[in-house]
Amino acid sequence: MVDVEGKYSPRLANKRGAARLAAVQALYQMDIVGSGVMETAAEYEAYRLGKDIDGDQYLDADFQWFLAIITGVVKDQKQLDPMLNQQLSAEWSLSRLDSILRAILRAGLWELINRQDVPIAVVMSEYVDIAKAFFEGDEPKLVNAILDSMAKKIRLLK
């Protein structure tokens, strides 16, 4: 969504959208800190989702959706990462990408594979919007291109 000044302004998130954003943040946290899924999930449920943190209000999120994403990504990461690496150039492997970008791509790909009930356009739009919230460069375009390519391959196989 673009505001009157031509700048990106994120849409108000629904509970699933808020869960996706929180899941990306949790995956990033687990990647950086090395915390486990259940520890991170408990922290988000108790102290983050729908809570006020240092004057910022976390959006209320669908906790079950959040939990499904983070547990699914961690469980399936050995399958997701090679699929994502195939979409990247030889010079830019998944390990070279920013941690938050890796989290966005992993969560988006996991949802494309495992949540066939969610339209492709919704998954792509949500994760591109998350990328726009974190990046001002070409990263959202990269997320769009990779998820679009993967969606075509995945949905053809199913």
Curated annotation (Swiss-Prot):
Q: Which residues form the signal peptide?
A: none
| Family matches, as SUPFAM superfamilies | NusB-like
Q: Does the keyword Transcription regulation apply?
A: yes
Q: Which domain of life is it from?
A: Bacteria
Q: One GO MF term, please? A: RNA binding
Can you supply one Gene Ontology CC term for this chain's record?
cytosol
Keywords, alphabetical = RNA-binding, Transcription, Transcription antitermination, Transcription regulation
What processes does the entry annotate via GO biological process terms? DNA-templated transcription termination; transcription antitermination
Protein's job: Involved in transcription antitermination. Required for transcription of ribosomal RNA (rRNA) genes. Binds specifically to the boxA antiterminator sequence of the ribosomal RNA (rrn) operons.
- Assigned protein family: Belongs to the NusB family.
Do you know which HAMAP family this protein is assigned to?
NusB
UniProt name for this protein: Transcription antitermination protein NusB
Give the organism the record lists.
Answer: Bartonella henselae (strain ATCC 49882 / DSM 28221 / CCUG 30454 / Houston 1)
